[in-house]
């Protein structure tokens, strides 16, 4: 903003810092609405989204920015946390807390105490539009513990997401952060391999073992790329057998063996593409999209007002989406501000 003010003054425009700030962040409702529609439509028509997050300080406090997107749209939202509750809130087109039989099954799987599940089930299907209504309902059901409230809220938000028409088969591709592990979750192979790349062998045998395993991982990756292009039952069997054989390998390097054990624990998410060939094998797109946001954050620093933070998220989302569709962001802004309506809604 200071750089923009300096440039405007060099052009002969007499403007104060306060006036520029108001021009940038006030009365931007139409842009906020278009950003909201981006997400709603993107989630409705997409087979998958990729996600990531980064730090985004606000008013001197730590905060986070969550990214959702794919090759068709980009959406940024800054909040105070990066929990699974926060991610589900970001995914929802509108806030809803819904309890259904499917949600109760999710809660049981997540380890919510049977007594809490029974009480919630006895209340039947519920649908709340505000956090206050949901908290009152939890209190009435005797769900008071911190973890119990968190798990129940996750389930209710997931139920609200599905109730708004988002498919339970929506693919979520991430770097492995647990808050993103919902619906049909796929893991980034580039991130998974970094664990092995960071290992340091203490002798020549250990170094050779590490390099061999890394080579095998990238061979599997190449086979998965081939499978995405032309799925076949035969290649699927080869990949699954190769994955199992690699993870069962005992090497001379104990840290490497431990890494292989964790790698095997993520088998379902790493091999998700065998069920859903349209899913990407890496999360590079989300990292690339969020990198521009990080650059802006480094230049401008933290946000000071809530409306300023909201505007930064909105215009970052709209600008990145314009680029994905080959639309000049300046032409887009001129079209919207002048009301010519030559550029259709980005959604």
Model segments located where?
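Catalytic center-proximal scaffold of phosphoryl-transfer enzymes
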Residues: 1-347
């Amino acid at each position: 903003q200071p750089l923009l003010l300096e440039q405007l003054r060099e052009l002969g425009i007499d403007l104060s810092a306060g006036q520029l700030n108001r021009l940038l962040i006030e009365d931007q409702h139409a842009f906020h609405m278009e950003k909201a529609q981006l997400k709603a439509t993107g989630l409705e028509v997409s087979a998958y989204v990729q996600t990531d997050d980064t730090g985004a300080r606000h008013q001197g406090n730590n905060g986070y920015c969550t990214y959702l997107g794919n090759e068709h749209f980009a959406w940024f939202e800054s909040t105070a946390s990066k929990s699974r509750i926060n991610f589900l809130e970001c995914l929802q087109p509108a806030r809803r807390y819904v309890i259904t039989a499917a949600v109760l099954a999710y809660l049981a799987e997540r380890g919510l105490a049977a007594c809490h599940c029974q009480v919630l089930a006895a209340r039947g299907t519920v649908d709340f539009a505000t956090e206050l209504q949901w908290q009152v309902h939890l209190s009435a059901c005797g769900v008071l513990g911190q973890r119990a409230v968190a798990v129940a809220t996750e389930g209710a938000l997931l139920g609200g997401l599905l109730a708004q028409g988002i498919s339970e088969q929506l693919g979520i591709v991430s770097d492995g952060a647990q808050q993103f592990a919902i619906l049909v979750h796929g893991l980034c192979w580039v991130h998974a391999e970094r664990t092995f790349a960071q290992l340091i062998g203490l002798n020549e045998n250990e170094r050779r073992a590490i390099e061999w395993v890394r080579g095998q991982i990238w061979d599997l990756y190449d086979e998965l790329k081939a499978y995405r292009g032309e799925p076949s039952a035969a290649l699927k069997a080869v990949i699954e057998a190769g994955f199992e054989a690699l993870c069962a390998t005992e090497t001379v390097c104990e840290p490497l063996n431990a890494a292989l054990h964790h790698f095997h624990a993520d088998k379902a998410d790493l091999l998700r593409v065998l069920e859903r060939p349209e899913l990407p094998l890496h999360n590079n797109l989300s990292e690339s999209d969020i990198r521009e946001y990080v650059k802006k954050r480094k230049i401008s620093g933290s946000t000071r007002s809530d409306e300023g933070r909201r505007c930064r998220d909105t215009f970052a989302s709209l600008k990145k989406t314009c680029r994905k569709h080959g639309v000049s962001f300046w032409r887009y802004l001129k079209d919207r501000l002048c009301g010519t309506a030559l550029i259709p809604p980005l959604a």
